[in-house]
Curated annotation (Swiss-Prot):
It is a peripheral membrane protein. Keywords: Carbohydrate metabolism, Cell membrane, Cell projection, Endoplasmic reticulum, Glycosidase, Hydrolase, Lipid degradation, Lipid metabolism, Lysosome, Membrane, Microsome, Mitochondrion, Mitochondrion inner membrane, Mitochondrion outer membrane, Repeat. Its EC number is 3.2.1.18. Pfam families: BNR_2. A motif (FRIP motif) lies at residues 22-25. Its main location: membrane. The gene is Neu4. GO terms for molecular function: exo-alpha-sialidase activity. Substrate binds at R23, R43, Y177, Y179, E222, R238, R383. Induction: Down-regulated upon neuron differentiation. GO terms for biological process: ganglioside catabolic process; glycoprotein catabolic process; negative regulation of neuron projection development; oligosaccharide catabolic process. This is Sialidase-4.
Length: 478
């Protein structure tokens, strides 16, 4: 492998001399042109309690580059006396409607105060656009409709941040998390809470919204979702446990099976938000190279096979498959739109525990498995060096590669988007991420890269060790 390529970076939002700061990016690709929508929080200072309102820049992709419009303030995305935070857009492909979810938090109440007191100050809000983000409708407060009585057991909650997804069934999903009140003491003055990921969903193209069940066991927070072939949903979440948490849903996010730690995806100190996006792998790339599977134990999957569990487990991916589909044939559709992405079936450990039983036909030979990309700071002690990770078997927590660092320096929150195949290139992706030279909240940057770039630049061995925690700048957790 030659010198590592670093994609060209464009700064879309930059901290101003007045102290005005831009944080918490979200990115959405709107076909067919496509149009890119880059969202962010505008804050009076870097502090969470000084969040103010949401802003947007629209970009048009032409001939491999993006032409960006000027910054606009989303004037309708606000509740009176509340601050708007955590942009989380999702597109309904059937109607072309964009739903921008966010939370509106009363005054300057910090999240930490809500967690300590058990007194929620957040509202679940949404605005919509039917013209690719040019105009936005009035705000909807969905708190009572979507959460209802469950809110009394939530110390606080938030959506995303980053993009939501739409499943093949049409269900719209918005990733979220809550600090659930486990118990109260001293007449309710002391509150014991634990964070849990979840999803809000709609089955009627956004007319009504509902709250799904929590990831039940491990502490999990800010998360993103990806569809899994076989009608499963994959959740990847921030955690204070030292590694990311993944969890599966067999009912499209209505509930989640117990989560499990992903040992190959380390968290920074106190954790950091990360982004995932799923896509169909190109059939021309052979899966035999152990370099891309993350483990020499991994063996290629047939795109159409029956799964037989050889070893029992009550949790995670293996437990899900054991309970719901011990001998279910899984086949990939031969034609799917670029916006409907799935994940390849797999296990939570050694793939030798899965036995292929369905002979591959000439048609199935043309079908490709699906992969995941994941973006997150590569530093383990601080938020440094934005990395792109690849998994060719997403349900296997050992399948992730080491990161390809696309930006050296302080880095924070990010959001990925899949743009599809482009002329003269392989599959193309975009990343919107917090960056800076001394702190991770100086800029929000944008870059484009292809799957070929990822395959060429992902490290294969221990070459990340010298970079991961190289001192550079000051990165404050949040």
């Amino acid at each position: 492998m030659g010198p590592t390529r670093v994609p060209r970076r464009t700064v879309l939002f930059q901290r101003e001399r007045t102290g005005l700061t831009y944080r918490v990016p979200a990115l959405l690709c709107v076909p067919p042109r496509p149009t890119l929508l880059a969202f962010a929080e505008q804050r009076l200072s870097p502090d969470d309690s000084h969040a103010h309102r949401l802003v947007l820049r629209r970009g048009t992709l032409t001939r491999g580059s993006v032409r960006w419009g000027t910054l606009s303030v989303l004037e309708t995305a606000v509740l009176e006396e509340h601050r708007s935070m955590n942009p989380c857009p999702v597109l309904d492909e059937h109607s072309g409607t964009i739903f921008l979810f966010f939370i509106a938090v009363l005054g300057h109440t910090p999240e930490a105060v809500q967690i300590a007191t058990g007194k929620n100050a957040a509202r679940l809000c949404c605005v919509t656009s039917c013209d690719a983000g040019l105009t936005w409708g009035s705000v909807r407060d969905l708190t009572e409709e979507a959460i209802g009585a469950a809110l009394q057991d939530w110390a606080t909650f938030a959506v995303g941040p980053g993009h939501g997804v739409q499943l093949r069934s049409g269900r719209l999903l918005v990733p979220a998390y809550t600090y659930h009140v486990d118990r109260r003491e001293c007449f309710g003055k002391i509150c014991w809470t634990s964070p849990h990921s979840l999803a809000f969903y709609s089955d009627d193209h956004g007319i009504s919204w509902h709250c799904g069940g929590l990831v039940p066991n491990l502490r999990s927070g800010e998360c993103q979702l990806a569809a899994v072939d076989g009608d499963f949903l994959y959740c990847n979440a921030r955690s204070p446990l030292g590694n990311r948490v993944q969890a599966l849903s067999a009912d499209e996010g209505t509930s989640f099976l117990p989560g499990e730690l992903v040992p190959t995806l380390a968290e920074t100190a106190r954790g950091c938000q990360g982004s995932i996006v799923g896509f169909l792998a190109p059939p021309s790339i052979e899966p035999q190279d152990d370099r891309w599977t993350g483990s020499p134990r991994n063996t290629p999957h047939s795109p159409c096979f029956n799964l037989r569990v050889q070893e029992s487990s009550g949790e995670g991916a293996r437990g899900l498959l054991e309970r719901w589909m011990p001998r279910l044939p899984l086949c990939y559709p031969q034609s799917r739109s670029p916006e409907n992405h799935g994940l390849e079936p797999g296990s939570d450990g050694d793939k030798t525990s899965w036995t292929p039983e369905c002979p591959m036909s000439s048609d199935s030979m043309l079908q490709s498995p699906t992969w995941l990309l994941y973006s997150h700071p590569a530093g383990r002690r601080a938020r440094l060096h934005m990395g792109i990770y690849l998994s060719r078997s997403p349900l296997d927590p050992h399948s992730w590669t080491e990161p390809w660092v696309i930006y050296e320096g302080p880095s924070g929150y990010s959001d990925l988007a899949f743009l599809g195949p482009m002329p003269g290139a392989s599959l193309v992706f975009a990343c919107l991420f917090e960056s800076g030279t001394r702190t991770s909240y100086e800029d929000i940057s944008f870059c484009l890269f292809s799957l070929a770039d990822v395959l060429e630049n992902v490290p294969t061995g221990l070459e990340m060790l010298s970079l991961r925690d190289k001192a550079q700048g000051h990165c404050w957790p949040s």
